[in-house]
A protein has these predicted regions:
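NTP-dependent small-molecule kinase module
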Residues: 84-87, 100-140
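ATP-binding Walker
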Residues: 13
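Glycine-rich phosphate-binding loop used to anchor ATP phosphates in small-molecule kinases
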Residues: 24-63, 70
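Walker A/P-loop
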Residues: 16
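A glycine- and Lys/Arg-enriched "phosphate-lid" helix/loop adjacent to the NTP-binding pocket
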Residues: 58-105
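Hydrophobic anchor at the beta1->P-loop junction of P-loop NTPases
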Residues: 7
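P-loop (Walker A) phosphate-binding loop of NTP-binding proteins
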Residues: 10
Length: 140
């Protein structure tokens, strides 16, 4: 059962855009937001904030009915998105490693996780797939 959807990823991967698409295309039947479980774990790594195993496990348990949608983008595309939007510079390597760390933790749990590359797929295509995942999972 999926009770909510969290859209995750580095800055400028298209999280907020996808939130709107999934919210609308799912008929607003399920809460959709950005920056949740995965960002909590990843940014604890980026900013050297200690997260105990106990806290991590409690977060994973609390998110058992969450669909985590992790958005990535090709590096050159991501760099261009940052540049043309005048976004503050980030250490791409550090942030990508932190999100990959969070991904490994989530994949080792019961939390449903899917990854999409926004350099390769449009928001509409991704939202269609996410809505299909929600429908299929909630039929079980």
């Amino acid at each position: 059962m999926i009770a909510r959807v969290e859209i995750e990823g580095l800055d400028r991967t298209g999280k907020d855009t996808l939130v709107g698409y999934v919210d609308y295309m799912s008929g607003r039947m399920i809460p959709v937001g950005s920056r949740g479980l995965m960002s909590t774990i990843a940014y604890a790594e980026v900013f050297n904030r200690f997260m105990s195993t106990e806290l991590t496990n409690k977060l994973l348990e609390a998110n058992k009915e969450t669909l985590v949608v992790y958005l990535t983008a090709d590096r050159k595309d991501l760099e261009l998105r940052h540049k043309i939007s005048h976004h503050e510079p980030i250490d791409f390597d550090k942030h990508e490693k932190a999100f990959e760390y969070a991904k490994r933790i989530i994949l080792g749990s019961d939390v449903l996780f899917f990854e999409f590359n926004t350099s390769k797929q449009t928001p509409y295509q991704i939202a269609e797939m996410v809505c299909t995942i929600i429908e299929e999972e909630n039929k079980k």
